[in-house]
């Protein structure tokens, strides 16, 4: 796949379980806005979160922090009125439009819904795992372990989705 813009939660979760590199197996270029960097690196380091240091290292090499331009900020200012989105999600969606990035990596339901309205394809942390499996970057067993690790690290999914994900993993060749 081509380029994608990421929100904070997938970065945090993947870094926590030591699988941030999965993103590189799916996307050629990954971008984040300043608000996401502030949340995952600056605030994370202030809280002494190990994942913050992992993500910071990636932002120096293969994850590209890119500011949202004033022009795009003005054009998509209506996103700022959506109280269900945090600043990182708003900036990330604007950055998708600015870069013509077809993919938005996010787990938040509202942010994914808004992405679809903007003709951006949302993909969550579980979707990244499934895509990595389909690309042959990981095995079925690794995919199962990643899903379990993500849940242990704070990914919230209901039983129905969990079963569906395991079925998809099992049926993947």
Predicted segments, located by residue:
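Active-site-proximal, substrate-binding regions of enzyme catalytic domains
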Residues: 2-5, 9-101, 109, 120, ...
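Short beta-strand and adjacent tight-turn residues that come in two discontinuous sequence segments
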Residues: 106
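Acidic, PIN/NYN-like endoribonuclease modules and their adjacent C-terminal/linker elements
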Residues: 112-173
């Amino acid at each position: 796949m081509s380029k994608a813009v990421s929100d904070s939660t997938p970065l945090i979760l993947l870094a926590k379980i030591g699988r941030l590199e999965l993103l590189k197996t799916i996307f050629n270029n990954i971008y984040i806005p300043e608000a996401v960097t502030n949340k995952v690196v600056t605030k994370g380091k202030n809280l002494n979160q190990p994942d913050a240091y992992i993500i910071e290292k990636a932002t120096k090499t293969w994850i590209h922090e890119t500011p949202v331009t004033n022009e795009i900020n003005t054009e998509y200012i209506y996103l700022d009125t959506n109280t269900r989105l945090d600043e990182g999600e708003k900036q990330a969606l604007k950055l998708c439009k600015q870069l013509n990035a077809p993919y938005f990596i996010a787990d938040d339901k509202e942010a994914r819904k808004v992405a679809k309205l903007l003709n951006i394809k949302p993909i969550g942390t579980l979707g990244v795992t499934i895509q990595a499996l389909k690309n042959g970057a990981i095995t079925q067993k690794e995919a199962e372990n990643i899903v379990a690790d993500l849940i242990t690290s704070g990914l919230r999914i209901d039983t129905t989705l969990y079963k569906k994900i395991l079925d998809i993993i099992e049926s993947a060749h």
